[in-house]
Amino acid sequence: MRVFRTADFPGFGDDSPQGFVQQLEALKDLLQTGVDPARCAQPMMGDPALPFRPWINMKQTFCAQPQIIEFHNGRGVRYVSYYSQGPNPVLEQEVFYTFQALTEDGEFYVSAFFPVETGIFPTEPPACPTCGEPDYDPFAEWTAVLGEQLIQLNAQPADEFEPSLNVLDELIKSVQIRN
């Protein structure tokens, strides 16, 4: 878990196409309007990604099971995600739970992430018997496979993740940020 002072964000510079200030504004908007589940129903290779700090040099490939959660003195969005630099197969060990939040006074941005096992994704890259064939479209295949996996992921009960999303949510609800 990381806690950032939001007053420091302008001094961090624009380290990514969506810098600290932009991520802060995106999170504020999301917490006001809520999360449209359809936003997390399809693979994405770029914006509009859900807010995520700290910045990593990859794109959010998907979000799943988004939910607004309140903690002792703030609220945020939790979701399951995966980041990649391209349309690579999602591997089980690279999927994680994240929570992105603000304290009630807006002074602190809270970011937490934990690995989770879903039981949906492979642990090794799958074989590709059609790779190299003239009509093979790797992006179309990636989109179709990941789309099916996201249907399963978004429908999966929270207790079927390891650790359970409910357990991680309870951990998040217990967080208290003090000056």
Regions found by a protein language model. Name each.
Residues M1-L50, A112-V116, I120-F121:
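A short acidic-to-branched-hydrophobic micro-motif
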Residues V35-E107, F113-P125:
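Signature of long, low-cysteine stretches enriched in small and polar/charged residues
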Residues Y109-V110, P163:
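Aromatic-residue detector
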Residues V116-N179:
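Surface-exposed amphipathic alpha-helical segments
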